[in-house]
């Protein structure tokens, strides 16, 4: 017998080191991959000065962006426009979803100064709309809800008039506690992603539960009826269009009014492969269906991600 795998605290496990310890799915890194269609080609900006400026600002304050940690395809566009999605509570996630490029492992203790550093960075960047997300922190008693609340509090104290969107984990087993903690410092938009369809959850989101996520969205809306709730879905992981439409309807049935829907892209050969590339006309169909279902805002397109042009979506602009 081999020696059992033991993780070291604070070490980032990525790619094969991460996905090899997922019991549900064996991923063959040598499998033949789908060719990326023309509409999925990204044109990089000629000038990277703004991009490097934001990266350096993050490093200087000891902060992380989900844009970098999750290898988002929109990083160059967003950073070039001076926007970023901040990722709090470290860069090591206690979950190991095989679609995600964020590192897995045993996280370090929370940085108690992070909320203040985050608020100061946002002030320096002169942001009017900010998205705050996090890794999953199943090691924390409140799953990180208190840290979210403290970040919102500090950001508002230094940045009057700012709009804050939080993209939260599922607070596994602590939904009621998390919502209670957020009562003192609620966000302007509450976002939690379903990611994909329930049939594929065991394979795509090990450790998560479709009904838990719907419950979180519903219960937050019940406590804060005037705060928009939002959720995101990836396509191209083996789901059908009919299943996606059912997830969209489930979201509406649970009070969600804002939707993001984009194409899944494989971060590396050690992650889940792309099962299909969805044509832009299909995304247009999903947006039309979302409007028919009663979503107030639906951003649907190949490169759409949860926080992609979040400020524009929150103000009612078209994002695709």
UniProtKB/Swiss-Prot annotation:
GO terms for molecular function: 4 iron, 4 sulfur cluster binding; lipoate synthase activity; metal ion binding. It comes from the Bacteria. Its EC number is 2.8.1.8. InterPro entries: Aldolase_TIM, Elp3/MiaA/NifB-like_rSAM, LIAS_N, Lipoyl_synth, rSAM. Pathway: Protein modification; protein lipoylation via endogenous pathway; protein N(6)-(lipoyl)lysine from octanoyl-[acyl-carrier-protein]: step 2/2. Gene3D superfamilies: Aldolase class I (3.20.20.70). Residues 79-296 form the Radical SAM core domain. SMART domains: Elp3. GO terms for cellular component: cytoplasm. This is Lipoyl synthase. It comes from Glaesserella parasuis serovar 5 (strain SH0165). The gene is lipA.
């Amino acid at each position: 017998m081999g020696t059992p795998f033991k993780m070291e605290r604070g070490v980032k496990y990525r790619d094969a080191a991460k996905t090899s310890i997922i019991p549900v799915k064996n991923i063959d890194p040598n499998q033949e991959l789908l060719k990326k269609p023309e509409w999925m080609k990204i044109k990089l900006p000629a000038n990277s000065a703004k991009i490097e400026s934001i990266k350096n600002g993050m490093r200087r304050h000891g902060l992380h962006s989900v844009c970098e940690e999750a290898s988002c395809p929109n990083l160059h566009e967003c950073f070039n426009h001076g926007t970023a999605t901040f990722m709090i509570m470290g860069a090591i996630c206690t979950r190991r979803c095989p679609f995600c490029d964020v590192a897995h492992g045993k996280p370090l203790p929370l940085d108690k100064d992070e909320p203040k550093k985050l608020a100061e960075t946002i002030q320096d960047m002169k942001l009017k709309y900010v998205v705050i997300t996090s890794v999953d922190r199943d090691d924390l008693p409140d799953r990180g809800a208190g840290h979210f609340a403290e970040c919102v509090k500090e950001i508002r104290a230094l940045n009057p008039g700012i709009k804050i969107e939080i993209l939260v984990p599922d607070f596994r087993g602590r939904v009621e506690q998390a919502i209670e903690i957020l009562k003192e410092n609620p966000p302007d938009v509450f976002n939690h992603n379903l990611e994909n369809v329930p049939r594929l959850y065991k394979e795509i989101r090990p450790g998560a539960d479709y009904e838990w996520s719907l419950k979180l969205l519903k219960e937050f809306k019940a406590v804060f009826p005037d705060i928009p709730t939002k959720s995101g879905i990836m396509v191209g992981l083996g789901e059908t269009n009919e299943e996606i439409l059912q997830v969209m309807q489930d979201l509406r049935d649970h009070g969600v009014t804002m939707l993001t829907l984009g194409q899944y892209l494989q971060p590396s050969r050690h992650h889940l492969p792309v099962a299909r590339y969805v044509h832009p006309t299909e995304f247009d169909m999903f947006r039309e269906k979302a409007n028919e279902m009663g979503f107030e805002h639906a951003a649907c397109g190949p490169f759409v991600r949860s926080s992609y042009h979040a400020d524009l979506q929150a103000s009612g602009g078209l994002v695709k």
